């Protein structure tokens, strides 16, 4: 079994009440030889957030729905994990939610990514499609795995690899929250980072719902006529992404991750 590069620290986000989830993840990670640090997830059901952490006005405008306590908990749990990473002094962090499932190549892929760390700042798993409009392979890895730049990315936050540059930029700019974390994290231009996805995906999602981010989904969307602002926000975000997309296609100067 290939060992994980020691420059990578692994964080697993898990709610205190999700003990079965933790046990299942322990087995999955043990099977591929990965040790981890558990991050006690912020439970949005009970957490009292501040205005510095969450902007309700912008959330309603950009998401078109009432506040979701689960989404707030998820967002702040990832923020907490990034803070722990920065304090760790490590070069890279793999951040996981407790519903991620890994294939047998996962550790080898992580080690390969470290060996080409000059190329990326943030790598998402299970978010790219092979070919198709807007999905461009920018670098081969091994056995058909490739890094992709995606003009129209899938939102996904269950597994991603970041370096210290990305972590510090995210930590400085993530708050206050006004969209779910998996929607915010794709804004590579805002954080000045090189962000890619991998195909074929080495990570999938367990079919059962994760506790992380799901609590509060009973919050209903507003009627259509109150959601027009959501359309404008999404169009604007895609335009900005399209304008900056070329940056992901340029070959970077070699640098240490």
Where are these regions (language model features)?
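An acidic/histidine-cluster motif and surrounding catalytic segment
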Residues: 1-96, 100-257
